[in-house]
């Protein structure tokens, strides 16, 4: 997920979607959220997309299985696993915000950051964590 900055030709989501497809990740495992402008919005909008896709998938599956005489377990017994692909310095905050908005089974998948800029990113991220904790996003 991720919107488009003023100096960017494509949304972050679109760029990552194309990258994941080029690496062989199938369409059914990807969702495209291009509206967010912050990590908090990323998680809120992504949760909405995941919830809607899962509702449609389960309704379709429930109907098909009912025709065969099978039942699905109740929705509350289904656990949806979500992976957050982000920078190594950003993983802690992204997972914390995801949990706060109700994405409980979340795993971080972190990419290594530029070692020259890593300290700068970590300092900036510390302030972002403090801000998100203060406003209740984490």
Residue ranges and their predicted role:
Residues 118-138:
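A transmembrane-helix-recognition feature enriched in membrane-embedded lipid enzymes
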Residues 1-124:
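A structural signal for short, hydrophobic/glycine-enriched beta-strand patches
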């Amino acid at each position: 997920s991720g919107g488009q900055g003023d100096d960017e030709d494509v949304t972050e989501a679109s760029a990552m979607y194309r990258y994941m497809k080029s690496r062989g990740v199938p369409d059914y495992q990807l969702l495209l959220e291009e509206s967010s402008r912050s990590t908090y919005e990323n998680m809120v909008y992504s949760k909405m997309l995941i919830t809607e896709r899962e509702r449609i998938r389960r309704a379709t599956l429930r109907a098909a299985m009912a025709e065969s005489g099978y039942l699905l377990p109740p929705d509350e017994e289904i656990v949806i696993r979500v992976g957050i692909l982000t920078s190594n310095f950003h993983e802690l905050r992204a997972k914390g915000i995801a949990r706060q908005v109700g994405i409980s089974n979340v795993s971080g998948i972190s990419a290594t950051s530029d070692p020259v800029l890593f300290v700068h990113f970590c300092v900036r991220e510390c302030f972002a964590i403090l801000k998100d904790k203060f406003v209740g996003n984490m």
